[in-house]
From Swiss-Prot:
Pathway: Amino-acid biosynthesis; L-lysine biosynthesis via DAP pathway; LL-2,6-diaminopimelate from (S)-tetrahydrodipicolinate (succinylase route): step 1/3. It is an enzyme of class 2 (transferase). Its EC number is 2.3.1.117. GO terms for biological process: diaminopimelate biosynthetic process; lysine biosynthetic process via diaminopimelate. One of its GO terms (molecular function) is 2,3,4,5-tetrahydropyridine-2,6-dicarboxylate N-succinyltransferase activity. This is 2,3,4,5-tetrahydropyridine-2,6-dicarboxylate N-succinyltransferase. Belongs to the transferase hexapeptide repeat family. Keywords: Acyltransferase, Amino-acid biosynthesis, Cytoplasm, Diaminopimelate biosynthesis, Lysine biosynthesis, Repeat, Transferase. It comes from Alteromonas mediterranea (strain DSM 17117 / CIP 110805 / LMG 28347 / Deep ecotype). It catalyses: (S)-2,3,4,5-tetrahydrodipicolinate + succinyl-CoA + H2O = (S)-2-succinylamino-6-oxoheptanedioate + CoA.
Length: 274
């Protein structure tokens, strides 16, 4: 693994000289191996180690190099054709491979190569970009987008039209992370490497980036870039210091633990937030 990492790190430093026609075989092989690691889930762009998220930047660099190494090519689809550098993950899958993976992929979902989708996950007609990790039991609902290298935990529900930001465009240092047992409401957007910690519930139409104020109404504390575990979050506003205007903020209206979540439905958690 260290040798693979070293080859990719060196190639990335010299990426301007790399093209589909000029790249050394060593670099091609290293990038292909890295994408295979991501595809199988044996490698992740980010993982939680000793309670802290650690980003493996070399795998993200492998994803970026993949684009340097490939020309656009025709991709066959059921009703159409496409033209891109990155093939789709399931293009040549057999029934046996689908059964072994244990995930449901509903047409016309688009899942790019270099993506991992865990057992009992359901991918409705949506888009999952290269480098993403979608863990077991997660629902990616209709028209949701899972951005490049995003990390989605176990038993997460990404509701219809949700956007989870990627790292490639614009280039971000760290991936957006949704931890286990989270619910992200319809049309919400979580971007720019924000971490939504375990067991949180994000209501419909909440937008969170690194500069978004995440206000805890119980404590008065303001967070940036992180939704604390067990938070129930709705869209709101905070007044300016002079009281002349207000600006958008995400508001933590309550905290819940795993026991409460098990007893109470998501809709109940979002009711009575006044």
């Amino acid at each position: 693994m260290n040798e693979l990492k070293a080859i990719i790190e060196d190639a990335f430093e010299n990426r301007d000289s790399i093209s589909p026609s000029s790249a050394p075989d060593e670099v091609r092989d290293a990038v292909a191996q890295a994408i295979d690691l991501l595809n199988s889930g044996k490698g992740r762009v980010a993982e939680k180690i000793a309670g802290e998220w650690v980003v493996h930047q070399w795998l993200k660099k492998a994803v970026l190099l993949f684009f340097r190494l490939h020309n656009n090519d025709v991709i066959e689809g059921a009703e159409s054709k496409f033209y891109d550098k990155v093939p789709l993950k399931y293009t040549n899958y057999t029934a046996e491979q689908f059964a072994a993976d244990g995930a449901r992929i509903v047409p016309p979902a688009a899942v790019r190569t270099g993506t991992f989708v865990g057992k009992n996950a359901v991918v409705m007609p949506s888009y999952v970009n290269i480098g993403a990790f979608v863990d077991e039991g997660t629902m990616v609902d209709t028209w949701a987008t899972v951005g490049s290298c995003a990390q989605i935990g176990k038993n997460v529900h990404l509701s219809g039209g949700v956007g989870i930001g990627g790292v490639l465009e614009p280039l971000q240092a760290n991936p957006t992370i949704i931890e286990d047992n989270c619910f992200i409401g319809a049309r919400s957007e979580i971007v720019e490497g924000v971490i939504v910690e375990e067991g949180s519930v994000i209501s419909m139409g909440v937008y969170i980036g690194q500069s978004t104020r995440i206000y805890d109404r119980e404590t008065g504390e303001i967070h940036y870039g992180r939704v604390p575990a067990g938070s129930v979050v709705v869209a709101g506003n905070l007044p300016s210091a002079d009281g002349k205007y207000s600006l958008y903020a995400a508001i933590i209206v309550k905290k819940v633990d795993a026991k409460t979540r098990a007893k109470v439905g998501i809709n109940a958690l979002l009711r009575g937030v006044e």
